Every structure is written in structure tokens, then in C-alpha cells.
Curated annotation (Swiss-Prot):
The lineage of its organism: Bacteria, Bacillati, Bacillota, Bacilli, Lactobacillales. CDD domains: DEXDc_SecA, SF2_C_secA. The gene is secA. This is Protein translocase subunit SecA. It is an enzyme of class 7 (translocase). GO terms for cellular component: cell envelope Sec protein transport complex; cytosol; plasma membrane. Its cofactor is Zn(2+). Belongs to the SecA family. Its EC number is 7.4.2.8. The keyword Membrane applies. It holds the Pfam family SEC-C. It is found in: Cell membrane; Cytoplasm.
């Protein structure tokens, strides 16, 4: 272990030496740049662009370009980047993570690589954790970029598509991670290229990169729409049932936070819902509602996982920042289950139209880099998932903060009393205190205890984060006491007030350890910025969440031996700190495995998503007639359907093909059974199915030509073809995403049968994807052949093609011959005799199977 640590430290030292060498090159240009007039310095940007166009690489331009930014910052902002900031900028340019301590000037550091990469003209995205920071940084640093001749845009969720397009077309665009992700998804749902807002993704520089790429990585970005509201009743029924259970009826696995019914719970469910077998295949949907109701009632905790707003809405609490996540909802029906639990109006369940994880979103950039104060603990994940190294940058001045060993109490009550006593002592001498809590309810409890102790203070949690920047800025003033849930207020510096240095600087008190060491380090890092003095102290109890889940029995025995009756007894030792960090490493390992699994599932979907989005983009941008593509779809649909029916009994096969032709290809009176028998040279023993394929293809080509002639102009034809394909693709893709969600839930259970769920998911999702392609081609064929076409102006084509853009398409979907079809002899995997081209189990046999 010691050898591994030594190797890591030596590697870091080697990197620092290389960075210092390049930084010195940058510094060597300082005098030359200082001698230039404003106009000459500003002209450098155009010179760099020209040199880049002439073949010089950005790496070659780096020393001079960084020097231009340094001199520009001095003249425009009154700031001159230190050597350590130049080193951080070099790390960022090369696509790695720069670990820079709080207060070391990350925002100014970013200006150098952002400027250099903007020279290519392909766009730079600066990603922040919230819109307040996007606006603040774009306004402050935008002065410098604009002065140097670069355009700066801010991409906010409230902006119109035209404003977003303008922001993305700038050299430098400030945005949040979620907004970039949603814009990407929305761009792949539009009908026309001119409605897209993004350019191809080039270079992203992510501020607080650990928060975005690690903490958010388990949360997929989802664009969804409502489904039938009849399901609301099931949420209430499942909730009513779950509330009748006792602790003996279900089992909770605390480390993984999963829950399931015991045998007694299953018996009660079967009695409550009047079922013979709860886990019968017909009850799959019901078990989903029961599972969600169990999680909502016995796993999800009010004021910790969510809060109920005054408007009677359930708001998610971000476990890493303590902020409420406006507009976000738990997926898979869990949010509705919580609404039923809390007795607030149950909002309509939604169906996913498009989704992507943060991991796959950011891996699409040509180059990705990031800054954070705490990234080293997650280095393996950055390297394995994003191919980024974490390089710690030395501080400009030595750190003077004193980090005290943890204090452990036996009960929560004893711990909180000790916290209040410590705060009171420091408040009385005027030292500012920042109290970090993990949950909203903890901050409320401590606030009440401080009020009782007569200590004035500010509370910063999920309930009032609008004021957070202002509260955090004043947290370093003499006598200030501030309670912050996790690291709300991250990104805003705490500057020390007059006379505070002499009192020991800002004291940070943690009321419990977070499950991630990184979050603890972020809290500690609020104190001791830029070489200021400071202190940090964590208070723990055996009743803390982390200690209950992963705490060592050894610690509990030590406390019991010391004094079982005195709850105010306290342990302070290095052994305790090591035990706590060991528990945190176990949790971090679990969380990493979870994120990795999310990525493995999304990687399967990513391949399919990229195929669909590439095909979509090809259709949207096509200036050509799409007739060859559509006729190829029609031909494949005919071949697929005829081949499918050819495996059946001869008479049934011919009837199935006839139904298909009448329903999807030609008018009813244009083809008869006798026609097929004649073309197929039918005898008692054989049918020439190849001849039938050729015959049907010729008929379909004639119908296609007649349909197209109804459109008078080339533009109208192309418009019709595009909307036809996009409408079908979007509908089928949405259904496919929904089916993949259900498949993922189903294969999870197969792990118990010794099958690898990921392998099963890959295999079955591939088959489903092939089926979806077949269904797309069938629907394009049927709609093309059966549409009632009439001219309609371009403006009237509805934008939301995924559900309503029928534009000038109105398809006949009734059974062509109006006769009842006998399904009694049809096998589960046979093609449906209705002529849809689907297997019976996925068509008219769906209810039966």
C-alpha cells in the first residue's frame, strides 16, 4: 500500500514539474505583452485564428495565447493570474481535471484554456452547477473575452430557441449541464434543421466537475410526456394497501436501500387486491405500483429525500447540495407514489420521449476538462469513465487551516448539545462559524437549539436557496453563525471580515460525516482560503446514518466499555477517523458500482440512440428526394412479411399476405386471393413466394407513384417524405425507450437466477431494436400507401412530430376487408394474420399472452 501511495505522489510531482516548465514559457512572454498597446494586444486574437487556420496547433499557440489572456486580465479585470493558475489552465487545456483548493481562483484560471480553445471557432462550453453561476461568470469574465474580440453567450432554460441558437453560436457559451443535455435531446426531436440550437459538441470545461460528472451521474436527463391519468387510482390503492402493513410484512436492506414484501406481505396483497398469485405475469404492472408505494412509505424520508412545498408539490432534495431540485421528478412512478403517500395531488405519470445520462452526454465532446477543489478521491472513476487524469495544483500560499480529529458521541442528542456549546463559545469571542448539515431536518433542529441558546444565525438549506449567495458571502464576518445544508452556496467565496484573522479565521463545524469524503473535504475547504487561518471539526454519533449503516462494532464496544450510562462521554482518536474513512470508502465503492452499472445499461441504449439520431439527422438535413429510401423500406417490409407468413400453413399464409397487402399496400379491390395464387403458381405442395414478393413490390411502386403525384412541388414532396419518416421514427423510438425501461427492470430479477443482467439486457434489447426497425418500416409503408394526401402550407405542420405531426398525413388503419379474422389457431410467435407484420404476441395476441 505504501509503495502504491509513493508511486502516486511521485507521478504527481513529475506532472507538476512538467506544468511548471510550460508555465515558465508563458511567463517569459509577460514583458513583451505588457509592452503592446491595447489595440495590438486585441489584434493577437485574429492573428492566432489565422495561424490556427494555417496549420499551427492549439498546443503550439498555448504559451503566447495564455500570456495574452494574463495581460488582458490585468488591464480589464485588474487581476494577474499566478503561476499556479497558469498550471491549472494547462491541465484544463489538455483535457484533465485540475484539483484547485477553494479560493485559488478557478474562475480566472479557466479564462486561459477557454480563450485558447475558442480560437478554433468550433465553440467552447463552460459548464456551471447552476444558472446563477453561469450568469455571474459570463458577466464577469465576459468583459475580458469581449475585450479580446470573442463573443460570449449565456444559455438559460428560460430562453427561446432563437436565443439559445444565438448563445450556442458564440465563441464561448456559459450553461448548466442539464440545459446542454436537454438541448441535445430536444435537437434530436425537431422536424427541421433550422429548429436545432446546438453546434457539434467541441470542448467543455466543467466547473465543480465532481458535482456534475460524479454526483449527478446516477441521474439521467429525461424528456417525457404524459400518459393516461387512469393510473392515478392505482397509486392511491397501492398506497392504501402498503399503509396497512406491519414491519413483519416487508424487509428493508439498509446498505442498498431496497425493500420487498415478505411472505406475510404477499398474502396480505393477494387478499387486498383479490388475487390468486401476486407475481402472476398478469400482475406485473400492479407489483410495480406496490414496489413504488413501499419505497415511498418506508425508504423515502420527508425533509431528507424530499420536501412538501407550500403549493402542495413534492420537491426533490439534492443529497449533495441540500438544494431543492425545481422541475425534477423521481422517475418510474416513484414521484407519484410519494404524492399519494403525502396526500397531495398526484400528477400525471409521464412517458419518456428521450433520455441520456450525464456520462454519455459529456463523453460526446471532442475534449472534456474540469475544475474542482476535491477530485483526487474519485480519480479512478474520472480515469475509467471519462479518460481524465486528476492533477492536484499546488496552492499559491501554504494552507494554515487546522483540521481537528473527529469527536464521537453515543447519541444524536449528546452530539447536538456539544455542537451548540462549541458554537456558543466561539460566538462569544466573535469567531465566525459555518455549520454544515447533511439534511434539512438537521439544520432546522440545530437552528431551534441555537435560538433557545440565544445565538443569532442564518439558515441556508433547500427551503431558501434563493438567498444563498448573499448569506454565504457574509458567513466570514465577525460573530456570524451560518447553518448550511451540505454545500449549498458552493462556488461563492467566503471572505473574512475585519478582525477575524486574529480570532483564528472561519471555523467549520460538520454535524456528521457525509457518505462521500469529497463532500466533507468541500465543507472543510470553505475555511482557510488563500493561506488564511481557519479550523474544522466534525461531530459524530453512533446514531448517524453512516455509522448505523457501516460503522464498526469495535467503536461501539469501546464506547460501551468507557461508560455505558453517560451519553456525554466523547471519543477523540485517529483510530476513529480511520474507521470513519474506511466506512466512507465502502459507500463510495457502492456508489461507484451503481454509477458504473447505470453507464453499462446506457451504453447499450447509446449505440441505438446514436443510430436513430444519425438517421434522423440525415432525414432532417436531406436536400434530396427520399424516394429511394422509402421504396427500400417498402420492399423490406414486403419481404419480411411474406417470409414470416411463408412458414405457416399454405392457405393461412396466403390469407395473411392478402390481409397485409389490403391493409398496408393497395386498395381492397386491387388484389384478391386468386391473384396471389396465380402469381405464386400455387400447387398443393408449393408456393412461389419470391414471385409474390416481386408482384407486391410492383403494385406498391405504382401506388407510391400515384400518391406522390398528388403533391404539386418538389418542396411539398420532400416535406411530406420527411414528416412521414420522422413521425413514425419518433413514435416508435418513444415506445422503444419505454420498453427498454421495462426490460431493464425485468432483467434485474434474473440476477437471482445466476444470469448476468447486463448480458441479458444487451441481447434482448438488440432483438427489440431490430423489431423496432421492422415496425418503423411497416408503419412508413402503410402510412405512405394509405395516406389521404392534401397540400398544406409548411407553417401548419405541427412541430411536435413525435406525437402529433401528422401534417398532411391521415392514414386509414381499419382492417381492409372489414371481416373478422380467426385467431384461434395462431401461435404465439407466428406473424399476426391481420397483416400488421408484427408477431401475434405483440399484436392481436397481446392481451391473451
Amino acid at each position: 500500500m505504501a509503495n502504491i501511495l509513493r508511486k502516486i505522489i511521485e507521478n504527481d510531482k513529475g506532472e507538476i514539474k512538467k506544468l511548471e516548465k510550460t508555465a515558465k514559457k508563458v511567463e517569459s512572454y509577460a514583458d513583451a505583452m505588457a509592452a503592446l498597446s491595447d489595440e495590438e494586444l486585441q489584434a493577437k486574437t485574429e492573428e492566432f485564428k489565422q495561424r490556427y487556420q494555417n496549420g499551427e496547433s492549439l498546443d503550439q499557440l498555448l504559451p503566447e495565447a495564455f500570456a495574452v489572456v494574463r495581460e488582458g486580465a490585468k488591464r480589464v479585470l485588474g487581476l494577474f493570474p499566478y503561476r499556479v493558475q497558469i498550471m491549472g489552465g494547462i491541465v484544463l487545456h489538455y483535457g484533465d481535471v485540475a484539483e484547485m483548493r477553494t479560493g485559488e481562483g478557478k474562475t480566472l484560471t479557466a479564462t486561459m484554456p477557454v480563450y485558447l480553445n475558442a480560437i478554433s471557432g468550433e465553440g467552447v462550453h463552460v459548464i456551471t452547477v447552476n444558472e446563477y453561476l453561469s450568469e455571474r461568470d459570463a458577466t464577469e469574465m465576459g468583459e475580458l473575452y469581449s475585450w479580446l474580440g470573442l463573443s460570449v453567450g449565456i444559455n438559460l432554460s428560460s430562453k427561446s430557441p432563437a436565443e439559445k441558437r444565438e448563445a450556442y453560436n458564440c465563441d464561448i457559451t456559459y450553461s448548466t449541464s442539464s440545459e446542454v443535455g436537454f438541448d441535445y435531446l430536444r435537437d434530436n426531436m425537431v422536424v427541421r434543421k433550422e429548429n436545432m440550437v446546438q453546434r457539434p459538441l467541441n470542448f467543455a470545461l466543467v466547473d465543480e466537475v465532481d458535482s456534475v460528472l460524479i454526483d449527478e451521474a446516477r441521474t439521467p436527463l429525461i424528456v417525457s410526456g404524459p400518459v393516461s391519468s387512469e393510473t392515478n387510482q392505482l397509486y392511491h390503492r397501492a398506497d392504501a394497501f402498503v399503509k396497512t402493513l406491519t414491519e413483519d410484512d416487508y424487509a428493508i436492506d439498509i446498505p442498498t436501500k431496497t425493500i420487498g414484501l415478505n411472505d406475510s406481505g404477499i398474502d396480505k396483497a393477494e387478499e387486498f387486491f383479490n388475487l390468486e398469485n401476486l407475481y402472476d405475469i398478469d400482475n406485473v404492472a400492479l407489483t410495480h405500483y406496490i414496489d413504488n408505494a413501499l419505497r415511498a412509505n418506508y425508504i423515502m424520508l420527508r425533509d431528507i429525500d424530499y420536501v412538501v412545498s407550500p403549493e402542495q408539490e413534492i420537491l426533490i432534495v439534492d443529497q449533495f447540495t441540500g438544494r431543492t431540485m425545481e422541475g425534477r421528478r423521481f422517475s418510474d412512478g416513484l414521484h407519484q407514489a410519494i404524492e399519494a403517500k403525502e396526500g397531495v395531488p398526484v400528477q400525471e405519470e409521464t412517458k419518456t420521449s428521450a433520455s441520456i445520462t450525464y456520462q454519455n452526454m459529456f463523453r460526446m465532446y471532442k475534449k472534456l476538462s474540469g475544475m474542482t477543489g476535491t477530485g483526487k478521491t474519485e480519480e479512478d472513476e474520472f480515469r475509467e469513465i471519462y479518460n481524465m487524469r486528476v492533477i492536484p495544483i499546488p496552492t499559491n500560499r501554504p494552507i494554515q487551516r487546522i483540521d481537528h480529529d473527529d469527536l464521537l458521541y453515543s447519541t444524536l442528542d449528546a452530539k447536538f448539545r456539544a455542537v451548540v456549546q462549541d458554537v456558543k463559545r466561539r460566538y462569544e469571542k466573535g469567531q465566525p462559524v459555518l455549520i454544515g448539515t447533511v439534511a434539512v431536518e438537521t439544520s432546522d433542529l440545530i437552528s431551534k437549539m441555537l435560538v433557545d441558546a440565544g445565538i443569532p444565525h442564518e439558515v441556508l438549506n433547500a427551503k431558501n436557496h434563493e438567498k444563498e449567495a448573499h448569506i454565504i458571502m457574509n458567513a466570514g464576518q465577525r460573530g456570524a453563525v451560518t447553518i448550511a445544508t451540505n454545500m449549498a452556496g458552493r462556488g461563492t467565496d467566503i471572505k473574512l471580515g475585519e478582525g477575524v484573522l486574529e480570532l483564528g479565521g472561519l471555523c467549520v463545524i460538520g454535524t456528521e460525516r457525509h457518505e462521500s469524503r469529497r463532500i466533507d473535504n468541500q465543507l472543510r475547504g470553505r475555511s482557510g482560503r488563500q493561506g488564511d487561518p481557519g479550523e474544522s471539526q466534525f461531530y459524530l454519533s453512533l446514531e448517524d446514518e453512516l455509522m448505523r449503516r457501516f460503522g464498526s462494532d469495535r467503536i461501539k464496544h469501546v464506547l460501551e466499555r468507557l461508560n455505558a450510562d453517560d451519553e456525554d462521554i466523547v471519543i477523540k482518536s485517529r483510530m476513529l477517523t480511520r474507521q470513519v474513512e474506511s466506512a466512507q470508502k465502502r459507500v463510495e465503492g457502492n456508489n461507484y458500482d451503481t454509477r458504473k452499472q447505470v453507464l453499462q445499461y446506457d451504453d447499450v441504449m447509446r449505440e441505438q440512440r446514436e443510430i436513430i439520431y444519425a438517421e434522423r439527422y440525415d432525414v432532417i438535413t436531406a436536400e434530396r428526394d427520399l424516394e429511394p429510401e422509402i421504396k427500400a423500406m417498402i420492399k423490406r417490409t414486403i419481404n419480411r412479411t411474406v417470409d414470416g407468413h411463408s412458414r405457416n400453413d399454405q392457405e393461412e399464409a396466403l390469407k395473411g399476405i392478402l390481409n397485409f397487402a389490403r391493409q398496408a399496400l393497395v386498395p381492397e379491390d386491387a388484389i384478391s386471393l386468386e391473384d396471389l395464387k396465380e402469381v405464386g403458381e400455387v400447387t398443393k405442395r408449393s408456393v412461389n413466394y419470391d414471385a409474390i414478393k416481386v408482384y407486391l413490390t410492383e403494385l406498391a411502386d405504382n401506388v407510391y407513384d400515384r400518391q406522390i403525384k398528388k403533391l404539386r412541388s418538389e418542396e411539398a414532396i420532400r416535406e411530406f417524405q420527411k414528416v412521414l419518416i420522422l413521425m413514425v421514427v419518433d413514435n416508435k423510438w418513444t415506445d422503444h425507450i419505454d420498453a427498454l425501461d421495462q426490460l431493464r427492470n425485468a432483467v434485474g430479477m434474473r440476477g437471482y437466477a445466476q444470469n448476468n443482467p447486463i448480458v441479458e439486457y444487451q441481447s434482448e434489447s438488440f432483438k427489440m431494436f431490430q423489431d423496432m426497425i421492422g415496425a418503423i418500416e411497416y408503419d412508413v409503408t402503410r402510412t405512405m400507401m394509405k395516406a389521404q394526401i392534401h397540400e398544406q402550407s409548411r407553417e401548419h405542420v405541427n412541430e411536435r412530430v413525435s406525437t402529433t405531426a401528422t401534417g398532411n398525413i391521415q392514414a386509414h388503419q381499419a382492417d381492409a376487408n372489414g371481416q373478422e379474422i380467426d385467431f384461434s389457431k395462431v401461435g404465439r410467435n407466428d406473424f399476426c394474420p391481420c397483416g400488421s407484420g408484427k408477431k401475434f404476441k405483440n399484436c392481436h395476441g397481446r392481451k391473451q399472452f
